[in-house]
Amino acid sequence: MKQYEYFAANYRTDKKRLKRQFAHDMVALLENENASIQDMRLGRKALKAQYKADKKALKKESKRLEKSFRKDFGMLRRPIMADIFDFFEEDRAVPNGKTPFNDEIKIEKDIVYKTVDGKQLVMDVYYPSRPIAGKAPCVMDIPGGGWMIHNRLRRDGYARCFAAMGAVVAVIDHRLCPEVFFPRDLEDCVDAYNFLCDNAERFGIDKDNITVTGDSSGGHLTMCLGIAATDPEYANSLGIPTTQTKPAGLICVSGAFSFEVMYRIPLTNTLIVRYVSGQKSRKAFRNWQFYKQSDPYNYLNSNLPPCYNSGGMTDFLCMGEAKRMSDALTKAGVKNEYTVGKNLFRSDHCYVLRFPFAPARKDALALYNWYFRLEKDLGVDMSKGFKRVETFMMQYKKALKGEIEC
C-alpha cells in the first residue's frame, strides 16, 4: 500500500466497523421484547446520536494521526494536482492511442526491470512489425505526470509510431513523489536504461543506439539522464549509477526543466514543485541538498548527444522552456533543434501527443522526422517506416478508417 493511502484505508475500515456495530445495536434494541415503544424511540435516537459522534471523533483522530505521522517522517499529502493529472490523462488516453498500427505491433507488458522496497518497477516493450535489417534502434520513453503520476498506456500512440518506424520502444515506470523525492526517480530511469543494455540480445536492440524521450516531468528526467550519462561527477554527486552507454539522442516534449522557473508560476509552485523535493517554500528549496543538481541547466555539457525539444506557445506549465533549453544547449556546444507550436488553441502542455488534432500531428511529425534524420546519420535506414508514420499524420482520418494503407 502506498504511504498516502494508508490512513485513508484505515479510516474506511474503522468506519465500516462502526457501521456494523451501529446496525448490531439497532437490531438488539428492536429484538428486546421487554422494551416499550417509548424506550425504543429514545434508544434509537440515542444510538443514532452516538453513531454520529463516533464517526466525527474517528475522522478527527484519523486526521490527527496522519498529520503527526507525516510531520515525523517528512511526508507530504498526495497533491490534488496528481488527481487532476489523472483525470485529464485518462480522458485523453483512448483517442491519443488510436493509430493504424495498433493491431500489428506486439507488446510485451509488465517486464520487471527493478525491485525496490518490495515494489516492482516495470516497463512495456513495443516490437516493430516490420523490423529493419540488423539490430534495431531503441527508444526509451519516460512518461510525464508532474513527477507524481504516470501510466504507460497513456503514451501508447506515441510509442507505436516509433515502433512503426522500426524501433523497439520501452515505456517505463519509476517511483513517484511524494513517496520518494529526486534523485530516486532519476535513479530508476538510469536502472531501466541499463536493464535494456543488459538485455539487448533479448530485445534485439543495439545498446549503443538508445534514444531517450520523455514529456513534461519525463522531459526533465530525460535531460538529467543524458547529463548523468556524460558527466560521471554529476551522477556521483547524486549517488546514482551512470549509464552503460551514451544515449544516441534525447527528445523532450514540453520538458519541465527548471524548478526556479516553476517557482515563479503560482500554479506550478503551489501544486507541483513543493512535492518534487519535499520543500514547502522557495527558501527551503534553495537550501535543499539537491537544489543545484535538480536543475539540468546547471550541468549542460558539450558531450551531450543531439537533442530535440518540443514546446507550445500556450503551455502555461512550462512556458518558453523549449526555446530556453535549446539556447542553453547551443551555448554549451550541443547539436539540437526545437519546435514551438503557434496555434492559439492547440499548443498547450504536451500537445504533440494528441494526435486527433491537426496542429499536434504537424509538430509530432516534425519530432518523428528529427528522429528519422538522427538514425540516418547513425547509418540506420528507417525511410519506409517513417513514410508510414508520415502518411498517418497527414491523412489521419482516412488512415484510421483503413481507406489508405500506411
Mark where each language-model region is.
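Amphipathic alpha-helical coiled-coil/heptad-repeat segments
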Residues: Y4-F7, Y11-L29, E33, M40, ...
